[in-house]
UniProtKB/Swiss-Prot annotation:
Family: Belongs to the formate--tetrahydrofolate ligase family.
PROSITE patterns listed in its UniProt record: FTHFS_1 (PS00721), FTHFS_2 (PS00722)
GO biological process: one example: tetrahydrofolate interconversion
Enzyme kind, highest EC tier: ligase
Gene3D superfamilies per the UniProt record, alphabetical: Domain 2, N(10)-formyltetrahydrofolate synthetase (3.30.1510.10), Formyltetrahydrofolate synthetase, domain 3 (3.10.410.10), P-loop containing nucleotide triphosphate hydrolases (3.40.50.300)
Protein name, as recorded: Formate--tetrahydrofolate ligase
GO terms of molecular function: ATP binding; formate-tetrahydrofolate ligase activity
EC numbers for this chain: 6.3.4.3
Binding site for ATP: T65, P66, L67, G68, E69, G70, K71, T72
Database matches in Pfam families: FTHFS
Keyword Nucleotide-binding: yes
Pathway: One-carbon metabolism; tetrahydrofolate interconversion
Keywords: ATP-binding, Ligase, Nucleotide-binding, One-carbon metabolism
């Protein structure tokens, strides 16, 4: 089979104005970046206010292996299938960071015959939004150190500065640095760090904002440090938020691309899913819902982490609620959850994974059962999509199908969208359209007036399967301080591994009865959530021994090769 890049480069793309017209957008509504990419002016939201709202579908998954289970591919393939059935559909997905693109995971444009194109700019720079986020973030960092250098009028305690610097490349050497070396003219010496840009609170803010003025207010609320008296210091206190907003004036506009089959795709924002909420922008979804019959979006990683945050954070920010949920499962991942196989990114797969073994699938299906249960907590029907691989066997598929039905899935269908594009997603599309018509009420997991500790314990026990939560003394002090400072009504955005429903990536399947540890609690006041840290979560990845960057090059004709 052709590589993803070969397929993408062979595609005949429609002019972007024609793609926009499918959504009812005019030339005045878009700002073109060449023939195949455009930004959408936010004024369309005012013009389309009276349009009926389309159906809202969110794609999630079982706990993934490091290789991923095809969630983005399924999202795109479902959008293509709906379009083939004569529905006006649009997919809304995240823009990938260049860190994973050059590292282990590769790009995030989907795969096979269900991709967003043009693939190269999608994975590299696109319209520069991530760079704008980095510039806004680093401007605030510079203004903090500048304030300390020029007298520290706000009486900031330098040891409490929590605002980092960012770069959109995985670079472990920058995780811990010393700034201010070389004499007084370079500012006070202090320990600092770099994060990858998509872990920035600015990225989370951009993804959750509902407009330019809301963006300005959110940026102003960012807390960067404490005074020596313990009061929070904000970006507004430093008079940085206005300039940060100006840097993001273009980045706030969603990007319009297309799928391989020419249907519209909105690509916007890319917050980390295990640190932030891990979903594409509220604005892209709002525009899509005013323009299309069906909007298909995705949440990060498994239902325990990405879908829960989608419901408890993103839906609260947008005022929207999903009509149906698609949960992607693979035979490969369920075999891995049996504990009998190790899947490591960058290493060859165990050949036995390709052999027929329904018993191994049955040994790992507890994760599927748990993730369907988690997805159903929020009140909407769940369609399980079995993402088919060529080496799957009917006996293994039947195990997955039966377990998903027993877990309460509305429907279980096989998906062939990787190999067949939209044509391989007809059954999935039909099931999803039927699910959207089901009665039921969307319900967040917890009320916002619940205490921070009670919210955390609700997540740990109802979603992660823990028996109880254990806090370090520092985490307990931080929770008390945040509530005293007036942040107690914020939702929780748990920072934890994506490789297990628990905090420990080694715990496969559906762990239960364990102690869920919280070692630290941080505040993202601008984004509007509290994020406790459970386990070892890195905000700056490192490159593997053989990063994907080694394979990427230019051929004799100037075409990109090796990008995946």
């Amino acid at each position: 089979m052709l590589s993803d890049l070969d397929i993408a480069q062979a595609a005949r793309l429609r002019p972007i104005h024609a793609v926009a017209a499918d959504l009812g957008l005019t030339d005045d509504d878009i700002e073109r970046y060449g023939r195949n990419i455009a930004k959408i002016d936010l004024a369309v939201l005012q013009r389309l206010t009276d349009h009926p709202r389309g159906r809202y579908i969110v794609v999630t998954a079982i706990t993934p292996t490091p290789l991923g289970e095809g969630k983005t591919t399924t999202t795109i393939g479902l959008g293509q299938a709906l379009a083939r059935l004569g529905k006006r559909s649009v997919v809304t997905i995240r823009q990938p960071s260049m860190g994973p693109t050059f590292g282990i995971k590769g790009g995030a444009a989907g795969g096979g015959y269900s991709q967003v194109v043009p693939m190269e700019p999608f994975n590299l720079h696109l319209t520069g939004d991530i760079h704008a986020v980095g510039a806004a973030h680093n401007l605030l960092a510079a203004m903090i150190d500048n304030h300390l250098h020029h007298g520290n009028r706000l009486d900031i305690d330098p040891y409490t500065v929590s605002w980092t610097r960012v770069v959109d490349i995985s670079d472990r050497a920058l995780r811990q640095v010393i700034v201010g070396l070389g004499g007084k003219e370079n500012g006070p010496v202090r320990q600092a760090q770099f994060d990858i840009t998509v872990a920035s609170e600015v990225m989370a803010i951009l993804a959750l904002t509902t407009g330019l003025h809301d963006l300005r207010q959110r940026l102003g609320r960012i807390v960067v440090a404490q005074t020596r008296d313990g009061a929070p210091v904000t970006a507004d206190d430093l008079k940085a938020a206005g300039a940060m907003t100006v840097l993001l004036k273009e980045a706030i506009k969603p990007n319009l691309l297309q799928t391989l089959e020419g249907s519209p795709a909105l690509v916007h924002c890319g917050p980390f899913a295990n640190i932030a909420h891990g979903a594409s922008s509220v604005l892209a979804d709002l525009i899509g819902l005013h323009c299309a019959d069906y909007v298909v979006t995705e949440s990060g990683f498994g239902a325990d982490i990405g879908f829960e945050k989608f419901c408890d954070i993103k839906c609260r920010a947008s005022g929207l609620a999903p009509d149906a949920v698609v949960l992607v499962a693979t035979v490969r991942a369920l075999k891995a959850h049996s504990g009998r196989y190790a899947i490591t990114a960058g290493k060859p797969l165990d050949p036995q994974l390709s052999e027929e073994n329904p018993d191994d699938v049955a040994a790992g299906v507890a994760n599927l059962t748990a993730q369907v249960r988690i997805a159903k907590l929020f009140g909407r029907p769940v369609v399980v999509a079995i993402n088919r691989f060529p080496d799957d066997f009917p006996s293994e598929i039947e195990v997955v199908r039966q377990v998903a039905r027993d877990a309460g899935a509305f429907e279980v269908v096989e998906s062939f969208v990787f190999a067949e594009g939209g044509a391989g997603g007809y059954d999935l599309a039909q099931a999803v359209m039927a699910a959207c018509e089901m009665p039921g009420k969307f319900t967040p997991l917890y009320p916002l007036d619940m205490s921070l500790r009670d919210k955390i314990e609700t997540l740990a026990t109802k979603v992660y399967g823990a028996a109880r939560v254990e806090y370090t003394p520092e985490a307990s002090r931080q929770l008390t301080r945040f509530e005293q400072q007036g942040y107690g009504a914020l939702p929780i955005c748990m920072a934890k591994t994506q490789l297990s429903i628990s905090h420990d990536p080694k715990l496969r399947g559906a762990p239960s009865g364990y102690v869920f540890p919280i070692r630290e609690v941080r505040l993202a006041a601008g984004a509007g959530f509290i994020y406790p840290l459970a386990g070892d979560i890195r905000t700056m990845p490192g490159l593997p021994a053989h990063p994907a960057a080694e394979r990427i090059d230019i051929d004799a004709d100037g075409r990109t090769v090796g990008l995946s």
